[in-house]
Swiss-Prot record:
The UniProt record lists the keyword Coiled coil: no
Lineage: Bacteria, Bacillati, Actinomycetota, Actinomycetes, Mycobacteriales
Record pathway: Cofactor biosynthesis; NAD(+) biosynthesis; deamido-NAD(+) from nicotinate D-ribonucleotide: step 1/1
Protein name per its UniProtKB record: Probable nicotinate-nucleotide adenylyltransferase
Pfam families attached to this UniProt entry: CTP_transf_like
Catalytic activity line of the entry: nicotinate beta-D-ribonucleotide + ATP + H(+) = deamido-NAD(+) + diphosphate
Top-level taxon in the UniProt lineage: Bacteria
């Protein structure tokens, strides 16, 4: 499952669980982007987003987190993500899960022509998005039936944008994301409207309940 995860929330986790059940996936690998090339806003540090994703997924044995995008230099492109995952799991059949709104801009992705050769794509609906296949595939020509699937996920009424705005205005984040992520956001002072003093990420700072 690819994404910025800034921050990760229950909508992401429910979407991953639902898609895993729908397609009988052995595991869901969360891949936080390193340097998202399409984002027009400030994105939190990659290590913060990675650690929040680890915290959020730790209790589910079906979930894991990969650093392939974070550890790769330069902007994050989905093509490179899928090629790296193939190299690490050469015998696995890959399903790439992402927001349906992201799939709508697929033609602007670098190397989009090769993407459908690398994985089955699953687009999950996000808040306010009208889920219509033709929005995504109208200019791509004919695709195999299993190349792209769109899935409605009601829990995606939760959005990372709203979570960031709530944190900026000191509004509660409880029940929108796992408790450990709420505590991590607070301890690291992420998304604050006015930046506070820097807090280093250390094992000690994560040992007070922020990390399972």
């Amino acid at each position: 499952m690819g994404g910025t995860f800034d921050p990760i929330h229950y909508g992401h986790l429910v979407a991953a669980s639902e898609v895993a059940d729908l397609f009988g996936l052995d595991q869901v690998v969360f891949v936080p982007s390193g340097q998202p090339w399409q984002k027009d806003r400030h994105v939190s540090a990659a290590e913060d987003r990675y650690l929040m994703t680890v915290i959020a997924t730790a209790s589910n044995p079906r979930f894991s987190v990969s650093r392939v995008d974070i550890d790769r230099a330069g902007p994050t492109y989905t093509r490179d993500t899928l090629r790296d995952l193939h190299a690490l799991n050469p015998d696995s059949e890959l399903f790439f899960i992402t927001g349906a709104d992201a799939l709508a801009s697929i033609l602007s992705w670098q190397g989009w022509e090769t993407l459908f050769e690398l994985a089955h794509f699953v687009g999950v609906s996000r808040p306010g998005y009208e889920l219509r296949r033709e929005h995504i595939t109208g200019v791509l020509g004919e695709l195999p039936d299993d190349a792209l699937t769109l899935v409605e996920i009601p829990a995606l009424a939760i959005s990372s944008t709203d979570c960031r705005q709530r944190a900026a205005h000191r509004r509660p984040l409880w029940y929108l994301m796992p408790d450990g992520v709420v505590q991590y956001v607070s301890k690291r002072r992420l998304y604050r409207a006015e930046p506070g003093p820097a807090v280093a990420v250390t094992e000690t700072s994560l040992s007070t309940g922020d990390h399972p």
